């Protein structure tokens, strides 16, 4: 289950996760501060990063399985300071990290993928040095941003087109 972390009761998810051992949990965080994450995911009724970390810990304690946080690295959020902030919030003994390669729409796909893959690999190394088990998701330049992260791009596009119906964080 991949989620951006709406503010809901996660108790039923923990219960079904205890009954079905193949259920995994991943939170799409993508930024190391709540301020940056609020700009990316502009919904008020969502968990902040500390609350996500706590919910993942509760899920881990209930299931014995490690949740993941998903992080799309770009030049402004792939610094050693970002890795430090994530390690301070998310215990590497509880959490694993998925680092997602993203491609810019204004670049030639192969060049964009190579550049973004290098960013992801560098950031992955920083997280591994903090004790995280990591994996890199690389769609190899395919445009799949609509899936995996709660269809974030489509939601952001809808909000831009309907500002009267949306309330940013």
Language-model segments: what does each one mean?
Residues 1-75, 96-98:
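Core AdoMet radical
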Residues 54-169:
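Auxiliary Fe-S-binding modules of radical SAM enzymes
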């Amino acid at each position: 289950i991949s989620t951006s972390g709406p503010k809901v009761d996660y108790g039923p998810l923990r219960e079904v996760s205890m009954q079905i051992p193949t259920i995994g949990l991943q939170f799409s965080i993508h930024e190391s501060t709540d301020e940056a994450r609020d700009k990316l995911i502009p919904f008020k009724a969502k968990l902040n990063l500390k609350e996500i970390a706590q919910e993942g810990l509760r899920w881990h304690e209930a299931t014995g399985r490690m949740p993941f946080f998903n992080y799309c690295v770009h030049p402004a959020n792939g610094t050693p300071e970002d890795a430090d902030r994530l390690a301070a919030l998310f215990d590497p003994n509880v959490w694993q990290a998925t680092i997602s390669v993203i491609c810019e729409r204004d670049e030639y796909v192969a060049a964009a993928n190579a550049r973004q893959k290098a960013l992801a690999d560098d950031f992955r190394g920083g997280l591994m040095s903090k004790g995280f088990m990591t994996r890199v998701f690389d769609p190899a330049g395919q445009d799949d941003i609509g899936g995996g992260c709660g269809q974030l791009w489509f939601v952001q596009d809808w909000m831009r087109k309907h500002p009267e119906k949306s309330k940013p964080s």
